[in-house]
Amino acid sequence: MLIVGGLIGVALIFDYINGFHDAANSIATVVSTRVLSPGKAVIWAAFFNFVAAFTFGTAVARTVGSGMIDINTVTFSVIFGGLTGAIIWDLITWYFGLPTSSSHALVGGYAGAAVAKTGFAAVVTGGWTKTIIFIFLSPLIGMTAGLTLMIAIHWLFRWTPPSRVDRWFRRLQLISAAFFSLNHGANDAQKTMGIIAGVLYTAHYIDTFYIPFWVVLIAYTAISLGTLAGGWRIIHTMGSKITKLQPVGGFAAETGAAIALLVATQTGVPVSTTHAITGAIVGVGATRRVSAVRWGVAGQIVWAWIFTIPAAFTIAAAAYALLRISGAQ
């Protein structure tokens, strides 16, 4: 009982860290365009993170919990090692202000601990295939949607005074930020649900793998509280270092990224909110001119993405090995 409670607690800590680490993804654009202050923005994002609990299903949770790693090979040590790898990598990247993916840190860590236990036979190829495809697809969807929206908006409002357009989109950006936060909560909180359900299944508290509703509620609560804690280092990178944004651009970026997340969530794929919003911001910036995008900063972010899964994998494998040496199963 204590082990189960402890692992659920660690999973919720990850969910909380995910919230404040990825809060920047939800609010960076609405803060950088000065539509909302950072304080109001995190409250706005946290509220819609939680509302997602009553809006979406649990397809992503099922993929993370049993569709990427053979659930029958999972032990408490595997779960703890996986969470340790994800949490440590998230804290390292948060400290340096790098907007990496908490999602990929989690699945990378989970895989690292499982492989350390039983080898690559523990890996479920189908779940990993669609996840890897979306690593490339989600930023492309975000970028294409952001680019297309910006072109369409410029054409539709080409005869409208810029000051009036700016005023309209300052209001509309509240809606786009809510839409993005809703989808951020839906995809990201479900990953923690999958891990908690794995704990319950391993402990034989549930006979078949499913997501109890109380797990849904505590996961969304944890990510919402984490979002309230914010994460200004990453907000600065996402909201101003990649490209300068106006309310029109903020609206297009948030909406484009939300579309990418919605597609992934409906198909049960655990994707990166960071990838989606970064791709959308790049697409928006490129509509002005290619040089409007600070490609050096974008390149640093891409390198952080590339290292996330192997880094979390390695840390988790090491954590699992230490647990085994100490006698844990």
Name these PLM-found stretches.
Residues 1-329:
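Multi-pass alpha-helical transmembrane bundle typical of ion/small-solute transporters
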